């Protein structure tokens, strides 16, 4: 026992402990300072090396007992293992080089550490705070075994150490104290052996070299691996990353979890607990420390087998067979028959055509002299190296070039003679008396004359006299050539690519409709017209199946179907948000329908407003009464939502509302001078704005801001002032048949569609002619529409396409409108040469609705 203690003492001295720090408080009663729990970095590294040797030794000793293998593996450890003095020769040699003063400090500390419990009790209160600080500075990882303190014995350290200590320090009193402390330690070990029984010597070797650790006020963390869960994915609880973990040696925590809370280091086991665990735990030899969490991880059988195979120099993969049977992939036997016995192709026996062409090109180059033979090449090279001859008395061409006129401009040719200079000109070229008097009056100002001579007529060429002005004209010609400067006119050649205007990219002009989103199906015949509610929640459609349908925009669900009794050619939702009303042009009737969708109070208010007809004080004239009648609604139509019926004497093509929602106009193209009717809803009156017909009227449109009415005939568009009752201007689209038109929300630009595949953009402040013509469609254009908020307009054509374009109108009157085609949407199907009929934009969103001959309405977003 004493020998083992002295060995531990010498190993502690050889570890070269650090001098006490400022945090260590001086001991009372004149004792030396308290040694910290943890040793220096050098001792810690020595301990790690011994621990690895311990693990490898236990792995190699498969047949031995776990406790025995631990005892053998710990022989190189810092703890006292037994009386095997010969195995510690390396440590004895290191102990001979140790310093004497360090041994004195260690022995003194050991004596003080073995003091009575009363003294320890008195010091515990004073040093409790100091121990906590020491834990922060010197505590190591959780799974790392605790390094023992300086061994307190030195009396029987070995055959070589004791004589040296006695010879060096014979008069030192500290040596006596060290011997006394060793004797006390032997007494403690004897008492412990008596308690543990006959096997105590085997199980408690080196217990006395580990003083008990003081208990701190910290709670122990539960072992993460108590349940045997060693999943790699669940072990990553410390979020500090791949950093050196010794940075946390001075702190109570080892990192942070996923919630940002500190991971507190679990307290270290004292020496006795660790020794008991080493002796009793069968898995102690396969337990390693996780540096991230500080917990102990028990290696599985697969991990231990992997380590054994690596140490034995074998393949780490257990399934790999080093002695697999040899498979001869490529045989060494010579085959008698060929594996691939395909006959040669015919082209392998024929001369190559590509080589024939190359030879032909070389022969042609030789004939043309492009390819020189070797003799010709040498002859030309010798001639180039030989002397060069030139004319000695040859003129200097450089000076002559300087005297010449550079960039000579050819003299203009004289104009050829005309019919008036003929000797027998036509009679109309001869002067009459008035023209002759006028020519003679410019005698003093000859430059004002159209001709510088008087045309004359002779019967034959023999009668032509001598021309008296010949010499003078030659002289003037010479003066012109001599004195008049000449100049070149540079003709600017402009390519066609420069004539195309540079338009911005469509990506910079978003948002605009690009894809089909919803399809509204339900009609059984082609849908000619559509209109949307001012709030954008509901859509009304009119079809040739003699019904109108009201749809919910967001879900494409048909809410209501109302029969009209005839083909529906036009529908228009009232723009006034205070009433809920739809105007429908069906055959010769105009129906005002309350759809009863949306706000119930709004629908009730509309019914109350249209319940009673106002009394007319003025009787309508016969011209109006024979053309239009406001009649009562039948009971069946009243239940369907029809509130007012207006009968016309001709078929109605279009119905459109004024911006305020009180006036609406209807168009009857076959009614001649009574084609346009303007109706007032509040007074239930109708009137003809025009007394004469200026052509076959196609459609009308109210100005969004001013009291103006746009009337489109087949070839012209007239703008009338309804207040002054006069014609403001007449627009000339230069087309043969106008189909529809739409006005910009600001009212300064008009878009006209024709059946001739063209669209015309009119700037009303600029000219009566089109500002720009757009030829984007391949068939007749049925309808056009502007967006109320975004700079967008769209057109629908019989080529089943709907084209969305960008139309920006600037507030600056000096800047023209920017028109850029954006997207062609071809989703409708063609039926009987009909494609898309009508288009309308959503009032607030950049969405587009289109109706077609395929009985569908499509929403583009």
Swiss-Prot record:
Its main location: nucleus. One of its GO terms (biological process) is maturation of 5.8S rRNA from tricistronic rRNA transcript (SSU-rRNA, 5.8S rRNA, LSU-rRNA). WD repeats lie at residues 522-561, 563-603, 692-730, 733-772, 776-815, 831-861. Residues 144-156, 174-190, 212-223 have a biased composition (Basic and acidic residues). Keywords: Nucleus, Repeat, Ribosome biogenesis, rRNA processing, WD repeat. Residues 1-237 are annotated as: Disordered. It is found in: Nucleus, Nucleolus; Nucleus, Nucleoplasm. Residues 29-45 have a biased composition (Polar residues). The keyword NADP does not apply. Residues 62-77, 87-143 have a biased composition (Acidic residues). Belongs to the WD repeat BOP1/ERB1 family. It comes from Culex quinquefasciatus. One of its GO terms (molecular function) is ribonucleoprotein complex binding. This is Ribosome biogenesis protein BOP1 homolog. HAMAP family: BOP1. GO terms for cellular component: nucleoplasm; PeBoW complex; preribosome, large subunit precursor. It holds the Pfam family BOP1NT. Required for maturation of ribosomal RNAs and formation of the large ribosomal subunit.
